[in-house]
Amino acid sequence: KVFSSLTCPHCANFHEVIFNKLKIEYIDKNLVRFEHHSFPLDLAALNAEVVLRCNTNNDIKFKLLEEIYKKQNFWAVGSDINRINDLIKKVGLDFGLKENKMDECLKNNEVQDEILNQRIEATKKYKIESTPTVFINEKKYSGEINYKSFKKIIEKNL
């Protein structure tokens, strides 16, 4: 389980540097299961997660998650939430999402409430204090952890 915020630079770095190696060595080989858990730290992250969930195709959703992190410096800038929403929708358009569908999703309070309630529950259950926070077999890891350290932890748990 990885709890992360889509506007968190440390989360983007984790996803780009560590996660991609884990994916090749363990996830793609079905040795390890990856679960993305949204832990939005701000409205921009919440809306980006809404756009991510707007897509029902899991294969595309996973690639869109990668792209959202990769383009974080493009869309997660400034404080104008309308501009940020337009920029995150541009990322979604590249993956075949329809603008009107994304607009519908962004106006859907049920989806936002679900994401926020999941965050509240994660805070209570897992004592999340920062992002990214990773759980491997229910053991919590947060802060700066390099790939080599993650690999050792995973190997020990296989």
Q: What do the predicted segments below correspond to?
A:
Residues 1-2, 33-36, 133-135:
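Soluble periplasmic/extracytoplasmic beta-strand elements of cell-envelope proteins
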Residues 2-8:
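Aromatic-flanked redox-active Cys/Sec active sites in thiol-based oxidoreductases
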Residues 8-14, 134:
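The canonical Cys-X-X-Cys-His
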Residues 9-10, 75-76, 105-108:
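Short, contiguous strand/loop micro-motifs
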